[in-house]
């Protein structure tokens, strides 16, 4: 039986790979997409997501979400993904539009109508998820779990300690981590290992139309290089759903720093249980890199 999922995203070049896997992995049933400001503005992430859905002829509803973090000024990752978020490929024109309600309400409505609890997957800042949990707490029993790409038990990537998706809206992340829902965190500890090799990248143009498109986007992606390999951060959240055997997880208490002058956005992961608090997050700490690199070509070959 396919696993029903809703995907909250901020495309973003590596988001495009994660979206492809979410659509085409036979184990998954992607039923709703929502966008959030993150890698670029929410107007751009929405445009990019609609372009991808049209490219794959995927009839999946999409709702536009939060344009700004809960309490602080927005930040983006255009230096990594380019000003548009997905430069490098000429997508064809289309007439697709987002739903007429905000993302968190679209998630609420879809959850309440679902015949079984749904897995939420968030691969951008957690603003939409925090709005859902704070404004619609009645939805919690309808959430099977939340799988996120975000955070780190060690070093950061936008500050010495903080990962971008959490640092972009620490207050939202703190709200989500305190919510009591089941959370799986695929952070930098595993995503920095999730590298597509130069040899594989070179084969993409001959794979299929998706391979050609991704190869064009990757030439503008700044999380690694075509010569050294590219990190597929967001894809790890989808990979865990399909191949959890590739990941080593540990239940930990995780808090999000929102006040520190130098540490705002840090996920404080209590790996050794020093604080004596019960675990609230399943933290991915290691990745079977060889297995991941074998799985990616399998799923992208289906993305025709």
Curated annotation (Swiss-Prot):
EC main class here is hydrolase
Q: Which GO terms describe its biological process?
A: purine nucleobase metabolic process; purine nucleoside catabolic process; pyrimidine nucleobase metabolic process
Question: Which one of the record's GO molecular function terms can you name?
Answer: uridine nucleosidase activity
Q: Does the keyword ATP-binding apply?
A: no
EC number of the protein: 3.2.-.-
* Keyword annotations from UniProtKB, A to Z: Glycosidase, Hydrolase
List, alphabetically, the Gene3D superfamilies matched: Ribonucleoside hydrolase-like
Which Pfam families did the record assign? IU_nuc_hydro
Q: Please name the InterPro entries in this protein's record.
A: I/U_nuclsd_hydro_CS (IPR015910), Inosine/uridine_hydrolase_dom (IPR001910), IUNH (IPR023186), Nucleosid_hydro_RihC_nonspecif (IPR022976), Ribo_hydro-like (IPR036452)
What cellular component terms from Gene Ontology apply here? cytosol
Active site at which residues? 233
Q: Which family does it belong to?
A: Belongs to the IUNH family. RihC subfamily.
Q: What does this protein do?
A: Hydrolyzes both purine and pyrimidine ribonucleosides with a broad-substrate specificity.
Which HAMAP family does the protein's record reference? Nucleosid_hydro_RihC
Q: What is this protein called?
A: Non-specific ribonucleoside hydrolase RihC
Originating species: Shigella dysenteriae serotype 1 (strain Sd197)
What is the gene name? Answer: rihC
């Amino acid at each position: 039986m396919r696993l029903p999922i809703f995907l909250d995203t901020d495309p973003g070049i590596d988001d495009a790979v994660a979206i492809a896997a979410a659509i085409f992995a036979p184990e998954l049933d992607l039923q709703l997409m929502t966008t959030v400001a993150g890698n670029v503005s929410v107007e751009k992430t929405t445009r990019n997501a609609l372009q991808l859905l049209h490219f794959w002829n995927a009839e999946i509803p999409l709702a536009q979400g939060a344009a700004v973090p809960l309490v602080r000024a927005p930040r983006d990752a255009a230096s990594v993904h380019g000003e548009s978020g997905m430069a490098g490929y000429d997508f064809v024109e289309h007439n697709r539009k987002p739903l007429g309600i905000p993302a968190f309400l679209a998630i609420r409505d879809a959850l309440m109508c679902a015949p079984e609890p749904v897995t939420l997957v968030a691969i951008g800042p957690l603003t939409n998820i925090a709005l859902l949990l704070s404004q619609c707490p009645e939805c919690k029993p309808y959430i099977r779990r939340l799988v996120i790409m975000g955070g780190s038990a060690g070093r950061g990537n936008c500050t010495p300690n903080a990962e971008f998706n959490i640092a972009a809206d620490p207050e939202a992340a703190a709200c989500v981590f305190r919510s009591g829902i089941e959370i799986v965190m695929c952070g930098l500890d595993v995503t920095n290992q999730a590298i597509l090799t130069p040899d594989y990248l070179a084969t993409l143009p001959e794979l299929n139309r998706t391979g050609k498109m991704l190869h064009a986007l990757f030439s503008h992606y700044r999380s690694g290089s075509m010569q050294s390999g590219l990190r597929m951060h967001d894809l790890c959240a989808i990979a865990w759903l399909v191949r959890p055997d590739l990941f080593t997880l540990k239940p930990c208490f995780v808090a999000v720093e929102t006040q520190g002058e130098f540490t705002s956005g840090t996920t404080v992961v209590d790996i050794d249980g020093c604080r004596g608090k019960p675990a609230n997050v399943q933290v991915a700490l290691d990745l079977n890199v060889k297995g991941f690199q074998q799985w990616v070509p399998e799923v992208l070959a289906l993305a025709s």
